[in-house]
Amino acid sequence: MKLNTLAPAAGSKSAPKRLGRGIGSGLGKTSGKGHKGQKARSGGYHKVGFEGGQMPLQRRLPKFGFTSASKGYVAEIRLHELNNVVADEVTLDTLKDFGLIRKDIKTVKVIASGEIQKAVSLKGIACTKGAKEAIEKAGGKVE
């Protein structure tokens, strides 16, 4: 068996019905489109969501919510992830260097999840109340 000899089993695949090729084909003359009307014409169909002039569903329902402009630029870091940083002073750039956050992140917040085993000094990084207590308990500080 070779790749160029692979073929489906005989009779397993049937050719698609060809439209408009005589009445004997079963889909001749109008090619399954019926008689006249918009849907029988070439290029004739309504846009997605069109309900024949009735107010469409997406316009009947109220708008809600908004897209936050800062969503993509804020990151959260767990407390135990700070153990991977081999530096006494942790800044935004330090976290980027160690691959803990993406390069385009502008603000970071440390959350109290897990434990921290070493003393670190946070500079220019926000943290929760629980995370601050844990960092100070381990001998670090938050600036």
UniProtKB/Swiss-Prot annotation:
GO annotation, biological process: translation
Keywords tagged on the record: Ribonucleoprotein, Ribosomal protein, RNA-binding, rRNA-binding
Keyword hit for RNA-binding: yes
One Pfam family matching this protein: Ribosomal_L27A
Stored Gene3D superfamilies: 3.100.10.10
Region (Disordered): 1-52
Xref: InterPro entries: Ribosomal_uL15, Ribosomal_uL15/eL18, Ribosomal_uL15/eL18_sf, Ribosomal_uL15_bac-type, Ribosomal_uL15_CS
One MF term in the entry's GO annotations: structural constituent of ribosome
Similarity section: Belongs to the universal ribosomal protein uL15 family.
Functional note: Binds to the 23S rRNA.
Protein's name according to its UniProt entry: Large ribosomal subunit protein uL15
Organism: Francisella tularensis subsp. tularensis (strain SCHU S4 / Schu 4)
